[in-house]
């Protein structure tokens, strides 16, 4: 029977006999004495085997990396000069008396402590990859976060209630994962993109405070922070307004960070969506970076420089400046790389001005401003740019001029890239946790492809008080009772006050050009139940995977999920998704179009 975990044996166990079980992390033969570093989930302990115990010595001699061993022995101090203060077990070792080989191991595809392994190799051999200490730490922290959430919400009176995994398809937003029904041929379930409607119905049912930590599914293109199946910390409350919900969830975030990382998140300032977009070009600004946009659209309406004037006069266009302190030292190569970078976001180029002498703001050859565009701008405009940005000698000013969406995304991304690469050395990056709430989101945004307004969050979000009539008369300026929790440039949680009246919900559907017939077909169960005395309610959902990625500093969300999918939505460990045989398809009343075409051609 195991008496101790390897990594937790310290000096308090000196002269005691212990039994440990684990994997051979490393084996060394030093002049007839064998040393084994035995590893389990808590860490490593050094085991010494000498020839005086011949059976144990023979077992140790046959063992290789990743063999599974049971070792019994006496704890003693390590010899002077061989201790490791970074480990709990670093001052002791076990002198083995008995060793049992519980299982042999084939040569692993990579060494457990090898950090230079491609992600494909890691994901194909995920079980071995999960033995690595970094992965063990990540998943342990994930567990601690989940348990902290449960403890906090339980203390706040929330009830953990499961909602269905097989539900109906309501294709608003991302694509659903569909599950064919065998007993109802030609009909399909959908895997939930969120428990949104069910948790609202639980409020109508009178449960008052609900939560669950649950899987959600979205069939969408993947990025570094996205997975087709992801875990959500989901909660909903009745009779609370947005301030009260934000207070509860802010308290939860603070408690979880304190318990798991011993970090005090401090205050959560609130920033209107319009301000976030105006100064940072993003609805999830990274406040560690002290760089802001400067608005120049009005100034450029009277300039002759076509690139800026065209964007300023364009419907929905924008011209902004981004001042970077001490950026005049950027090389031509660096600026070219930044130009290529903003092109990813649709920018056609990246204009800049290096500020060498603010005392000479002419547009002539002797100007204190260095740039190919200086000669195309009036001296008044140059002075105004320097004044508005507050630029000083040694700075560089980057410009964005295009449709507002392109400018916000391109210069917003540039702000992050420059801030992370140069901010720490130049005083405009603070390496600490910077949370905030982004509030007052627009209710709708215009989708040019669909030629209609769509919901910014989802169609069940309530309009801001006094904005109900704007849903139809002026949807572009209608604000929502929505709020996002943002931390270091990541949206870690999003929520809203919901619509609790059926007539208001029907108006929102109408504003989204969802016909009464379609409303009843897709959402009739919601509309019908809202008529039975639905309480005012609202909630919020946190992305657990994203939150733990941020807390661990992992490079990818895949590093905090035990068995993740690749960016092509595949599991390399099990080779999923996979084809199924014709019998299974027939049972589901399905036929593959490609196979049918091949059969017809034959």
From Swiss-Prot:
Major place of residence: cytoplasm
Residues engaged in binding ATP: 218-220, 227, 491, 543-546
Keyword Transit peptide appears in the UniProt entry: no
Keywords: Aminoacyl-tRNA synthetase, ATP-binding, Cytoplasm, Ligase, Nucleotide-binding, Protein biosynthesis
Single GO cellular component term: cytoplasm
SS bonds (residue pairs): none
Record's subcellular location: Cytoplasm
Transmembrane segments: none
Reactions catalysed, as given in the entry: tRNA(Asx) + L-aspartate + ATP = L-aspartyl-tRNA(Asx) + AMP + diphosphate
MF term (GO), any: aspartate-tRNA ligase activity
CDD domains: AspRS_core, EcAspRS_like_N
Record function comment: Aspartyl-tRNA synthetase with relaxed tRNA specificity since it is able to aspartylate not only its cognate tRNA(Asp) but also tRNA(Asn). Reaction proceeds in two steps: L-aspartate is first activated by ATP to form Asp-AMP and then transferred to the acceptor end of tRNA(Asp/Asn).
Family stated for the protein in its record: Belongs to the class-II aminoacyl-tRNA synthetase family. Type 1 subfamily.
Name under which the protein is recorded: Aspartate--tRNA(Asp/Asn) ligase
Source lineage: Bacteria, Pseudomonadati, Pseudomonadota, Betaproteobacteria, Neisseriales
Gene: aspS
